[in-house]
Amino acid sequence: MKRLLLPCVVALSYFSCSLKDNSSAIESYDYSFEIVDSLQIDYLGSLWIIDFDSSSQSYLARGNRDREFMVLDRNGMTLSTLEFPSDGPYALYGPINPIGLRDGEIEFHVMNLGFFRYDFNGNRIWQYKLPFNYFYINGLSGDAIYPLGDAIAFVRPERAEVVTDESLTSIFEGVYGQPILEVIDTVSNVGRETMPFPPNSMYSDGNFNYWMFPTIIRSGKEWILYFRNEMKFWVYQEEGGEVNFDREVSLEVDDAIKPIGVPFEKEEDYSELTENNYPGTIREIYRAKDKILVIYHKGIPEELARQVDRDEASGRRELEKLKQYYVAVFDGEFNLLQNDIPVPKGLIFTTILTEDGEILALKHPDFFETEDDFVVYYKLKLLN
């Protein structure tokens, strides 16, 4: 399963990108990342495709309305529309996040209500409420839950009792270094933690770096973890119900803008001190059969960021246009084959990699400043 933003030169530049010279260690490869097909969905407004389920060959999408979700077939035709209730005996209060598909069922989390499974007709078929008070510091991406033996695993939430003052300092000093996953036996309600915090992360440097936005990609017994503003990721292996650290993998990108951390005593000034700091970051990671593809950008130089008025919509669009996205390609053993492969501009990448090796990305209407009759998703593929 799964997991947003993005000038014009020539129209062709959106569909085919030439390669940048790479180091001699990987110069024997000649990959390109190109649009090979598209998906046009007859829908008025914004429609975000969240996930694809190979067992049912269906997409899950979020529509315009707050709780409007749709199940689409692989051609983009609507199979069913669901609107989760906000009142009544089956009311769901609060944001639904994260949400995805697994084996023909919709799985999601609602803060302080727990985890849910629904069928495509909107019928609730399973619910589990955590046996303690908790919260998440910010939004999540990835799957809502991960089966782990007879238990379920999910990104570890914070207990309410960790809040010791009015600032978030105490929370983050405790978060940095803690295991990533919580594991719960839903019968006995017995819990434990696994997936140790990765070594050599910038979030372990003793500074305040805000929330890590941990994102997990699971493929069989292999788990991949990456954080916001890190140009590397970590691989874990599942064994005996534990998710153990295996290795760190670098994108080997030396010219990315570095993130700025601040001392914890200056935490309240973080936004002001980092106002013009737009560091490089990983946007998505895709695990194919014999390769790993990583979408990333290198950030925006401070001198350019200072020139943009972020209070205006046009300024925010300009910032996105300044971000050039790239692909890094690794083999199945995480050896880097090629990096800095340019990505067509104006796309918002989903977490979806199809069985045909195609990555789904939304054509960003604000980027192109156009009004289309359809919601357009492009299918991109690594070509050699």
Please report, for each region that a protein language model flagged, where it lies by residue.
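Conserved blade-ending motifs and adjacent loop-strand segments that build the rim/top face
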Residues: Y136-N138, V249-E267, N335-E355
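Asp-box/WD-like beta-propeller blade repeats and closely related beta-sheet repeat scaffolds
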Residues: L113, F120-S170
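A short helix->beta-strand "capping" segment at the edge of beta-propeller domains
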Residues: D21-S46, N335-D340
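Blade-loop segments of beta-propeller domains
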Residues: M77-N112, W126-N138, V343-L347
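Beta-strand-rich domains and repeat architectures in extracellular enzymes and scaffolds
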Residues: D37-R67, R283-R287, K291-H297, P301-L304
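Structural signature of eukaryotic scaffold interfaces centered on beta-propeller domains
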Residues: S46-S54, I96-R102, G142-G149, W211-S219, ...
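Beta-propeller blade signature
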Residues: T169-S188, V235, E312-E333, F374-N384
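Short, conserved, GDST-rich strand-edge loop motifs in beta-rich repeat architectures
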Residues: R156-V175, H297-K321, H364-Y377
